[in-house]
């Protein structure tokens, strides 16, 4: 078990207090025990932190000052890891402890896997049961592909990427290093492209061949049952470090920048470009052919129908979307709309009665 001193050095935190024992992992404030670490990154949980039984807390300097001045009824002897960003330090420490419990996929190929003779599969890879790997596929070192996943022809998957069961990766897809793709994801299906050919008596929708690729950069995580369509003629691109939640739809020719986060059930229409470091809430949706500036935040269920050109703005609203501050003001007015209506009726009644 790592000691407090070892953890403080590894995660560049200042250590306050002494712990005679090591730590087994992390836990929530209300459940943590003396051999576990918890964290405080929200003022609302200060009192709960003061009463926690955790043997160590990751805190900011201001939170440490509060906790030392308000020890709480529990009065547990604990140590503090003082960090500039407690939440980020918690995340990195959680990664550290999780590695000890992560399943290790031993290298080797399950006998039920079907691998084309032209595919390149290094000996360090793990290929699970009933996996299909097509012609011309190239896998990097230590790639793990779990059961029932399918990798179609000429796709390239770089080293240390993990693909969970029942993932479908279509042809010519490019996936970078250290990516994680969860079950049910479909990468590289045809984009939704059809041209109308109608007359007064009938017609049809003419399918446009989708000849582009999906290109996924390094350190991307893609949630369960998310779908990313291949480009029509150019590529659909996901930037490095971007994290995509479950059941997200990304249409053809979309470009998502680096280090974005996209929450569940969001939908991005074709040819829209999302900047770097954007935050997209759950079930937010974007019209096609838009450009979204860097560091834009879009609240959940918000509809974006116009490009956003100024970086760092926060948009909220079903229709129309607007700056978050303006939406809050309008929402407050909307809550009092019935009272305003009653007052106007009374004023109108008094006016008509001459009083």
Swiss-Prot record:
The active site is at 252 (proton acceptor). GO terms for biological process: lipid A biosynthetic process. One of its GO terms (molecular function) is N-acyltransferase activity. It holds the Pfam family Hexapep. InterPro entries: Hexapep, Hexapep_transf_CS, LpxD, Trimer_LpxA-like_sf, UDP_GlcNAc_AcTrfase_non-rep. GO terms for cellular component: membrane. Pathway: Bacterial outer membrane biogenesis; LPS lipid A biosynthesis. It catalyses: a UDP-3-O-[(3R)-3-hydroxyacyl]-alpha-D-glucosamine + a (3R)-hydroxyacyl-[ACP] = a UDP-2-N,3-O-bis[(3R)-3-hydroxyacyl]-alpha-D-glucosamine + holo-[ACP] + H(+). Keywords: Acyltransferase, Lipid A biosynthesis, Lipid biosynthesis, Lipid metabolism, Repeat, Transferase. Catalyzes the N-acylation of UDP-3-O-acylglucosamine using 3-hydroxyacyl-ACP as the acyl donor. Is involved in the biosynthesis of lipid A, a phosphorylated glycolipid that anchors the lipopolysaccharide to the outer membrane of the cell. Homotrimer. Belongs to the transferase hexapeptide repeat family. LpxD subfamily. This is UDP-3-O-acylglucosamine N-acyltransferase. It comes from Polynucleobacter necessarius subsp. necessarius (strain STIR1). The lineage of its organism: Bacteria, Pseudomonadati, Pseudomonadota, Betaproteobacteria, Burkholderiales. The gene is lpxD.
